[in-house]
Design a protein with these regions (language model features):
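Interhelical loop/hinge segments that connect adjacent transmembrane helices in multipass membrane
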Residues: 1-12, 81-84, 213-230
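Interfacial transmembrane-helix starts/ends
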Residues: 3-4, 50, 82-99, 103-111, ...
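Helix-loop junctions and terminal segments of transmembrane helices
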Residues: 60-82
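Interfacial segments at transmembrane-helix termini and the short loops linking adjacent helices
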Residues: 43, 91, 111-141
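Alpha-helical transmembrane segments of polytopic membrane transporters and translocases
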Residues: 9, 42-63, 95-99
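Membrane-interface helix-loop junctions in multi-pass transport and translocation proteins
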Residues: 161, 171-204, 209, 213, ...
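Residue-level recognition of pore/gate-forming positions within transmembrane alpha-helices
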Residues: 57, 92, 105, 141, ...
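Membrane-interface junctions at transmembrane-helix termini in multi-pass inner-membrane proteins
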Residues: 139-169
Length: 231
């Protein structure tokens, strides 16, 4: 029963996330067509954005193992050592995640043009579009990392359902933002990564508030002093 209590919310959250990704694509493609872009132009924009998303997901390959490894570590500390040891592990995880996420975020944001030119082979207008998209996605990595580590911390404490609810709320914010921003002629496809950024910001805030409310000793030092953004 305990295993199901953890597995069901996580499985439901993963399925809902995939559904929202499909809805996001449908929304921004529809908005681009409504703006007067041809199907070919809209498909090109989707392809460029998809390539930028692939680059955006690369830092997760380094951050995800951290979040996976801290769950049993925190659980064992809670069982054998108490809340203080668990809190120390959580704060270390936040700092280490920041050490990985911050260079990736600013590196991709500041070097968006040469990175997309090298990995995507773009030039001209497509390169300019990829640069703008990658810049926004670069800064999104910061909040994505915070979401990953805070979700793992709450799961280790047995609160697997709350991160899923927060993720669904952030997903709705993302979809609404994409619908509004992608429908603006001056923003168009740039509204898609901007909506993603807004969604992750909302999830990050909700996760932090949830940890302060649900955890006996949340990693307050790391979060209140914004260790993640200064690591």
């Amino acid at each position: 029963r305990g295993l199901l209590a953890i597995a069901i919310p996580i499985t439901f959250g993963s399925a809902a996330l995939q559904l929202m990704t499909m809805l996001e694509t449908k929304i921004y493609m529809g908005q681009l067509l409504n703006l007067g872009y041809t199907q070919s132009a809209a498909d090109t924009m989707r392809g460029v954005y998809g390539m930028c998303l692939t680059i955006f997901n690369m830092p997760c390959a380094f951050i995800t193992p951290i979040t996976i490894s801290i769950i049993p570590a925190i659980t064992s500390h809670l069982t054998l050592c108490g809340d203080d040891e668990a809190k120390a592990t959580e704060e270390s995880a936040v700092r280490i995640t920041g050490l990985v996420a911050m260079p990736c975020a600013f590196g991709l944001a500041l070097l968006a043009e040469p990175i997309t030119a090298l990995l995507g082979g773009y030039s001209g207008g497509n390169l300019a579009m990829a640069t703008r998209l990658m810049t926004v996605l670069g800064f999104t990595i910061i909040f994505n990392a915070l979401v990953l580590v805070s979700t793992a911390i709450m799961q280790a404490h047995g609160h697997a359902g709350r991160p899923v609810i927060n993720m669904l709320i952030g997903g709705v914010v993302n979809l609404v933002a994409v619908y509004v921003l992608a429908g603006m002629p001056l923003i168009n496809i740039l509204g898609t990564p901007t909506g993603l950024l807004m969604g992750y910001v909302v999830i990050s805030i909700l996760n932090i508030l949830s940890m302060r409310r649900l955890l006996p000793k949340p990693p307050a030092e790391a979060l209140e002093r914004d260790r993640l953004t200064r690591a």
